[in-house]
């Protein structure tokens, strides 16, 4: 069936997280702090990795790109959500809604591929250490990053190819703080069951399969690491544990939401907040709290910046 976009709906109303005025003021302050911390934390990782020569390795190159994606993922909807806490009319245009969904799936798809790439990097480093630099060459790392963005773009376009032409004639209330595909297609004036099945197969099941494969991959890596007792193995165990935590935090909410798109659970809003805001905030903490190299480089960078400012202000 071909649909033409003769929608009566020109904008969508975002119901947000709460209708309580007191809670909205609290959310405004809370999420403003969280968003600022997310951007600054991920930006600090990107700058630290770019400026420190001893961090110019495949693992940190991929980590820097992950931080950039996380920073972008936290920015596609959060600034508008924060501003909407102070607005009575929480609306978004049809084009703005489609744009939000495009960037959500672009960044989500890119992050999935990048997390798989980071898993592959750890597998090669631990299971094939003698061939690590040969396999994880600069060309390979750049190729993996480019591949992640290509997959993200194609995934986003595949999700919107049919959605953008659906007729929307009311109601126009989206029960979330941003436009998410499962919620938006429910508002269409036609039966979207087939589109929902397509969404399950391209988003939900892919996320679930990738998550299972990553769990198996990290299990193999951790078993290999546990068989060793050297200091290097202890460091590898710490690194892989951090990677596995990030994978779980990202894939858990995504899988739950997109495997059951026909059912709207009360916890869906919480999960949406988790993988679009909290996970990008926690990733810098998870990757740096037990990583001595990154913490040392951050202290060195901060000290250099502080000394430069002090010198500039000295008469």
From Swiss-Prot:
Disulphides: 97-189
Leader peptide range in chain numbering: none
Membrane side Cytoplasmic: residue ranges: 50-57, 121-139, 220-235, 290-315
Compartments (UniProt record): Cell membrane
CDD domains from the UniProt entry: 7tmA_OR4-like
Family: Belongs to the G-protein coupled receptor 1 family.
UniProt name for this protein: Olfactory receptor 4K3
Source species taxonomy: Eukaryota, Metazoa, Chordata, Craniata, Vertebrata
Gene that this polypeptide is encoded by: OR4K3
């Amino acid at each position: 069936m071909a649909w033409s976009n003769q929608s009566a709906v020109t904008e969508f109303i975002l119901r947000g997280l709460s209708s309580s005025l007191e809670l909205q003021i609290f959310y405004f302050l809370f999420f403003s702090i969280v968003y600022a911390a997310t951007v600054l934390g991920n930006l600090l990782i990107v700058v630290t990795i770019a400026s420190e020569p001893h961090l110019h390795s495949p693992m940190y190159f991929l980590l820097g790109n992950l931080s950039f994606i996380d920073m972008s993922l936290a920015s596609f909807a959060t600034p508008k959500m924060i501003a909407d806490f102070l607005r009575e009319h929480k609306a978004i245009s049809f084009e703005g809604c489609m744009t939000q969904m495009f960037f959500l799936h672009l960044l989500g798809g890119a992050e999935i591929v990048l997390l798989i790439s980071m898993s592959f990097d750890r597998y090669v480093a631990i299971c094939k250490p003698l061939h690590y630099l040969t396999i994880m060459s600069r060309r390979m790392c750049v190729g993996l990053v480019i591949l992640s963005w290509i997959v993200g773009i194609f995934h986003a376009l595949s999700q919107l190819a049919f959605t953008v032409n659906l007729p929307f004639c009311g109601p126009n209330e989206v029960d979330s703080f941003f436009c998410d595909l499962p919620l938006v297609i429910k508002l269409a004036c036609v039966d979207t069951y087939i589109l929902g099945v397509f969404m399950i197969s391209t988003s939900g099941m892919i996320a679930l399969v990738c998550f299972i494969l990553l769990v198996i991959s990290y299990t193999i890596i951790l078993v290999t690491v546990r068989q060793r007792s050297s200091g290097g193995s202890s460091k590898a165990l710490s690194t892989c544990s951090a990677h596995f935590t990030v994978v779980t935090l990202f894939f858990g909410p995504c899988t739950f939401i997109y495997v059951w798109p026909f059912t709207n659970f009360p916890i869906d809003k919480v999960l949406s907040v988790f993988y679009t805001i909290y996970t990008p905030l926690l990733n810098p903490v998870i990757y740096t709290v037990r990583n001595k190299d990154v913490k040392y480089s951050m202290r060195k960078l901060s000290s250099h910046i502080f000394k430069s400012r002090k010198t500039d202000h000295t008469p």
